[in-house]
Every structure is written in C-alpha cells, then in structure tokens.
C-alpha cells in the first residue's frame, strides 16, 4: 500500500511540473498499480481496467479481483475536487490595454471513462481552455468593466469551459481571477482618475452642504417672520379686544351715570344741583381754553366769577324751559308760541354771552 501511495504521489508531482512548464504531459505507465489479482481501490478514486488492450470496466472503491495477464490497470482518475493554478498570461481589453492576469481553476472528474479516453491529459486541456477563454472574454470588456465585473467574468469563463469540457467528462466548478497587473502608465492614469473623482465628490458634497445650509437659514428666517407676524396679529387682536372692552365699559359707566343723573334730577332740588354742575363745567371750560389753546376766549368781565355763574345758570334755565321733542307734553301742547319764545330766549342768551 505504501508503494502504491508513493507511486501515485510521484505521478502527481510529475504532472504538476509539466503543467507549470507549459508543455503537454505524457502519462507515465510506470506509476500505475500492478495487477495482483486482489486489489483494494481507495475511496474517491476510479481505476480504469483494460482487458487485452480494450476497455473492460472501472473498478469502484473497495475489494476488486482481476484476471492476471489479461487485465491491466490503464488509468487512475481521482474523483476529488482538483485545484489548478492557471499561469499568468497577457490579454488585451476592449480599449487596447494590455493586462497580465492569472487565476485559479476548480474542477472535478465526473466521468472517468471520458476523462481517460476523451483527451490525452484532461487537466492540461482544461488549463489551456481556461487561458484562451479568459483572453477571449477580456477582449469583450473595457478596463473599467474588468475591475467592476470580475464575478460576471468568472461566471462567463466557467460556462465556456463547461460547454467545451463536457465531452472530456470534466466539470468546472468555479474560476477565480487572482491578480490583474496593469502597465505603470495606465496605473498612474487610473490613480489620477481616482483622485479627480474624489475631488469631484468632495466638491459636490461641499456644494450640497452649502445648499442645505442656505435652505435651512432661509427656512429659519421664514418661520421667524411667520411667528413675528402671528405675534403681531395676536397683539393687535388683543389690543382691539381691550379697547373694545374699555369703550364698552366707559359706555356702560356713562349710561349708568346718566341714569343716576336722571334719577337725581327728578328728586327735590334736582334743578339747583344741575344748575350748579353746569356752572362748574362752564367755568372749567374757560379755564381749559385759557391753558391749552392759542385762541383765548374771554368773558366781558373775567374777574367777576359771579357773572360767569349767572350766565351759565341762564343757559341752563333756557335749556330746561325748552320742551324735549317727542315727549307727551310737547306733543300735547301744540303751542308753537312757547317753542318760539324758548328758542328766542335761548338765542338771546347765547348772543349775550358772545357779546360779553
């Protein structure tokens, strides 16, 4: 068993060295197991047996018995997943940029018969197919898309390999691009492009920040003006309501005063009290005219207060003698002579005040 393992390891090392050199390997028959009649096939391996030079059967893992001399183990295929490094190669993109690119290929033998008789060396064939497919797919893409669409590029290479390798009994599980090397000048231009893009983004972000700041300031001023106008409106409404309440209160107070005055006039000596009030207001009016106005209205004898009071009493007496229009007394009298006499006396009294 140790001898068989050593022979298998030597065969794999030989195959790997041939793949790295880029030459198609030739299968060495010296590393194959010998027919010892009773054979034990390891797990995940398939041994292809030929009988008298023709394919006979495939030995499955476990105990197997062969006929000496007639049966011969011709191929040993591993059913495990195989990892192959695809050598670095040059490829030209759609925009005429030369790249150095390599990758890793993951495959598995699905049909040992096709892998043994369909191609001389399936692993080498798949490696060459991966290289040519990668060059073909890179020629369809620009340099920017090669970096942006690595996953789609890997999927395209896997699909192309599976279509061609189906007759070889091999299935490509996945393909991964390892490194992409660009020329120094292209790398410098890409770096400049990245820096320009960053400056552009910074400028755009700065302008957006300035715009948002201006919008926020304008919105704040707008809200401040709206609040100020609403406050002024509320103040005016409150002021108007206060003034209306004050006017109403004054009117009610004045009406109450008039009612009280009217009630007082109907009492005993009410006329005398009214005459005294009129005289006081008469004298106060002359005092205000003398203080607040440039036009001075003086009575005939300003030093005689008694005469001023007498004049005021005369005006009040003339007013009290005149009937009030619409009252029952004025309507029932029907005498125009009394009204004319009252008007005449009132006019005479006013003329006398003016003359004095």
Swiss-Prot record:
Signals that turn on the gene: Up-regulated in activated B- and T-cells and upon mitochondrial stress by chloramphenicol.
Protein name: Stomatin-like protein 2, mitochondrial
Signal peptide interval: none
Phosphothreonine modifications at: 327
Coiled-coil residue windows: 215-252
Tissue spec: Ubiquitously expressed at low levels. Expressed in lymphoid tissues (at protein level).
Region (Disordered): 321-356
Family: Belongs to the band 7/mec-2 family.
MF terms (GO), sorted A to Z: cardiolipin binding; GTPase binding; T cell receptor binding
Principal location: membrane
Record's keyword annotation contains Cytoplasm: yes
